[in-house]
Regions:
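Acidic, low-complexity cytosolic segments
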Residues: 2-10, 14-197, 201-227
Length: 227
């Protein structure tokens, strides 16, 4: 499931580790796959709202793709510090993260061709809008059912074409890219001795079908490096 910024997840989405999901450098073909708002608590990250575009994936894989998007977004937030911006690269996909000092966080999962500057501007705008509409007292215990915020789908659709979204970035100060923490792979988020397989197995976000797809993809990927 490449959209979740993980080699294993890429394999899940394609159905086999040798498949490559094609994409073009044309801006019209750049893609945003998910936009999530989370709260970074003392014991983990809570998904408050999420919007997804999995239309480019096989119909039968879409549920698992979306599950792994959520899993990856939560892990990224949990392993990052408040007040930070970070980008995680895996294959041809990028996860962009911004955690405010008040523990409200946003994650965008995008095609690698999509401009990072636009992604971070989107996160700034979304978190600002969300914080104005949803009282902060509801964040620590909130979830997708209890939080009433309907703006994410519109943001995800509007920003699919970065050229249309780009004029809005002029409202924002230029982002100092030197302050963005870069992670080469999802594995770099793990602590010493920690295994992604174990996190997947213990995850409450992933359903049994998604975990089964992950295991199958891992087995296939162990003997094939074409991704």
């Amino acid at each position: 499931m490449a959209v979740t910024c993980s080699t294993e997840i890429s394999a899940v989405a394609s159905g086999n580790s040798g498949a490559v999901i094609g994409r073009c450098a044309n801006s019209a073909d750049m893609k945003l796959y998910s936009l999530s708002i989370l709260y970074k608590g003392a014991t983990g990250a809570r998904l408050l709202k999420g919007a997804y575009d999995v239309s480019s994936f096989s119909f039968f894989q879409r549920s698992s793709v979306q599950d792994f998007m959520t899993f990856t977004s939560q892990l990224f937030v949990e392993r990052s510090e408040n007040g930070s911006r970070a980008t995680m690269k895996e294959q041809d996909y990028l996860c962009h993260l911004y955690i405010r000092n008040d523990s409200l966080a946003g994650v965008v999962i995008a095609d690698s061709e999509y401009p990072a500057r636009v992604c971070f501007t989107l996160l700034d705008k979304v978190l600002d809008d969300f914080s104005k509409q949803v009282d902060s007292v509801d964040w620590p215990s909130g979830n997708q059912n209890s939080i009433h915020y309907t703006g994410l789908d519109a943001y995800l659709a509007r920003y699919q074409n970065p050229r249309e979204a780009d004029p809005m970035t002029k409202v924002q100060a230029e982002l100092d890219e030197t302050k963005v923490i870069l992670h080469n792979t999802m594995e770099s988020l793990l602590e010493r001795g920690e295994k992604l397989d174990d996190l997947v197995a213990k995850s409450e976000v992933l359903g049994n079908n998604s975990k089964a797809f992950y295991k199958t993809a891992r087995k296939q990927n162990s003997c094939c490096e074409i991704m």
